[in-house]
From Swiss-Prot:
The keyword Transcription does not apply. PROSITE patterns: G_PROTEIN_RECEP_F1_1, G_PROTEIN_RECEP_F1_2. GO terms for molecular function: C-C chemokine binding; C-C chemokine receptor activity; C-X-C chemokine receptor activity; coreceptor activity. The chain crosses the membrane at residues 33-59, 69-89, 104-125, 144-164, 188-215, 232-259, 276-293. This is C-X-C chemokine receptor type 6. It is a multi-pass membrane protein. It comes from Pan troglodytes. The gene is CXCR6. The lineage of its organism: Eukaryota, Metazoa, Chordata, Craniata, Vertebrata. Glycans are attached at residue 16. InterPro entries: CCR1-9-like, Chemokine_CXCR6, Chemokine_rcpt, GPCR_Rhodpsn, GPCR_Rhodpsn_7TM. CDD domains: 7tmA_CXCR6.
C-alpha cells in the first residue's frame, strides 16, 4: 500500500539468483496476503463503523463530548477502509486508476490516519478530565461540547495540512508494474518523522500520562465500576500498543538502517506489521462502542426497528438489556466519572 512499496528495486538486481528468487517468492506472497488482509479489514471495518455511526447519530444523538469524538472516529475509519479495495486490486494486478485517483487515495489514507490517532488522543484527554476533575467537567458540559466540536474540526484541518506533501508528491510510477506512491526520499523522511510524532509517539505519551492518573484515581474509588473501568483502560492501551508499535518500530528502523532494504525477511516483517496496524479500523468500534451498555441497548433498538430478527426472539433479551442499562445509568455522576460509557 502507500506506506511501503514492495515492488521497488532496493538493490535486489545486484544480488545473486538466490536472492532474486527469494524476492520473487515474497512478491507472490504479498499478492495474496495483502489483498486478503485489506478485504477483511474493509468488510469488518465497513460493518462495524457503519453501525457505530448509525447508532451514535440516530439513537444516542451525541449527548456528550465523548459522543462527538466517537462520531468522528468511525467516520475517519469508514473513509479509510473504503480505500482498501483499490489497494487490494493494485496489490494483485497494478495501479489502473490514474494519477488523480492516486493522489486522492494517498491523501484520504493519510488524512484518516492522522485523524483517527488525534481523535484517540482527544478521547483520552476527555476521559482524564471527566475522571480526575469530575465536578468541573459536569458543570461545564456546554462549554466542553463546544470545545469538542471545534477540536474535531481542527483535527480534520490539521490532518489535511499534514497530508499535503503526500497529495502533492503522490504519483503513478512504472517500475516492474504501475504503482501509486511518492518517490522522493526527502519528502518521505519528512512525512515519516511527522507521522511518527503525531501518529504514534504523541498519542502514546498522552495515553500513558492520562491513563496513569486515571488508574490512580479509580483505584481510590472502589466498587464494581472501578474494576470495569480498569479493564477498559487496559484493553485500550493493549490494543493500541499491539497494533501500532510493531509497524512504527519497523518504520523507524527502515529510516535509519538502509541496509535492511536488501533483506527479504525485513520486507516480510514490514508487510505483516503494516497489516496488523490497519486492524485498528476494525477494533476501534469494539473498544469504543461495543463495550458500552448504552450501545448494546441502542443496537437492540436498531435490530427491532429494522426487523432483521424475529421480534419475539429478541424482545425479551432487548428488554433485559434495557433494564440493566437503566440500572447502571441511575446515577449520572457515577457514569460520567467511570470510563464505563466507552
Amino acid at each position: 500500500m502507500a506506506e511501503h512499496d514492495y515492488h521497488e528495486d532496493y538493490g535486489f538486481n545486484s544480488f545473486n539468483d538466490s536472492s532474486q528468487e527469494e524476492h520473487q517468492d515474497f512478491l507472490q506472497f504479498s499478492k495474496v496476503f495483502l489483498p486478503c488482509m485489506y478485504l477483511v479489514v474493509f468488510v469488518c471495518g465497513l460493518v462495524g463503523n457503519s453501525l457505530v455511526l448509525v447508532i451514535s447519530i440516530f439513537y444516542h444523538k451525541l449527548q456528550s463530548l465523548t459522543d462527538v469524538f466517537l462520531v468522528n472516529l468511525p467516520l475517519a475509519d469508514l473513509v479509510f477502509v473504503c480505500t482498501l479495495p483499490f489497494w487490494a486490486y493494485a496489490g494483485i494486478h497494478e495501479w489502473v486508476f490514474g494519477q488523480v485517483m492516486c493522489k486522492s487515495l494517498l491523501g484520504i489514507y493519510t488524512i484518516n490516519f492522522y485523524t483517527s490517532m488525534l481523535i484517540l488522543t482527544c478521547i483520552t484527554v476527555d476521559r482524564f478530565i471527566v475522571v480526575v476533575k469530575a465536578t468541573k467537567a459536569y458543570n461545564q458540559q456546554a462549554k466542553r461540547m463546544t470545545w469538542g466540536k471545534v477540536t474535531s474540526l481542527l483535527i480534520w484541518v490539521i490532518s489535511l495540512l499534514v497530508s499535503l506533501p503526500q497529495i502533492i508528491y503522490g504519483n503513478v510510477f512504472n517500475l516492474d508494474k504501475l504503482i501509486c506512491g511518492y518517490h522522493d526520499e526527502a519528502i518521505s523522511t519528512v512525512v515519516l518523522a511527522t507521522q511518527m510524532t503525531l501518529g504514534f509517539f504523541l498519542p502514546l505519551l498522552t495515553m500513558i500520562v492520562c491513563y496513569s492518573v486515571i488508574i490512580k484515581t479509580l483505584l481510590h474509588a472502589g466498587g464494581f465500576q472501578k474494576h470495569r473501568s480498569l479493564k477498559i483502560i487496559f484493553l485500550v492501551m493493549a490494543v493500541f500498543l499491539l497494533t501500532q508499535m510493531p509497524f512504527n518500530l519497523m518504520k523507524l528502523i527502515r529510516s535509519t538502517h538502509w541496509e535492511y532494504y536488501a533483506m527479504t525477511s525485513f520486507h516480510y516483517t514490514i508487510m505483516v506489521t503494516e497489516a496488523i496496524a490497519y486492524l485498528r479500523a476494525c477494533l476501534n468500534p469494539v473498544l469504543y462502542a461495543f463495550v458500552s451498555l448504552k450501545f448494546r441497548k441502542n443496537f437492540w433498538k436498531l435490530v427491532k426497528d429494522i426487523g432483521c430478527l424475529p421480534y419475539l426472539g429478541v424482545s425479551h433479551q432487548w428488554k433485559s438489556s434495557e433494564d440493566n442499562s437503566k440500572t447502571f445509568s441511575a446515577s449520572h455522576n457515577v457514569e460520567a466519572t467511570s470510563m464505563f460509557q466507552l
